């Protein structure tokens, strides 16, 4: 997972924006279609760049039998009552009305995460903007009758 995140960070960083990182050390193994996850992360970063004020952070980690990656920004954020609707195609938050966009970015992210048996959450970032976190299952195999994460 971190290798895919690193590729997106490298591609999306540049003279227009710098991306802070908080990637868990070491490998995070998940079953994924790398191009799809790249598309999801890129959509999340573009969303953060479009609606934020310049600060973007991409992080990853694991918790129990799940891995996660997230993108945070320092924009106006999304009101809690609007969050559940943002994953629907063509729906945009109130703070997005003054900027260009189709309202498809988070719907595409939701579809990709769903296709990976994952879960998508919206919250507030450490700087008051939007935090989008995707949870993906960590594969488990049986070894000597015991379950073990790979």
Question: What do the predicted segments below correspond to?
Answer:
Residues 29-32:
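Conserved micro-motifs of the catalytic ATP-binding
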Residues 78-90:
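Short conserved segment of the HATPase_c
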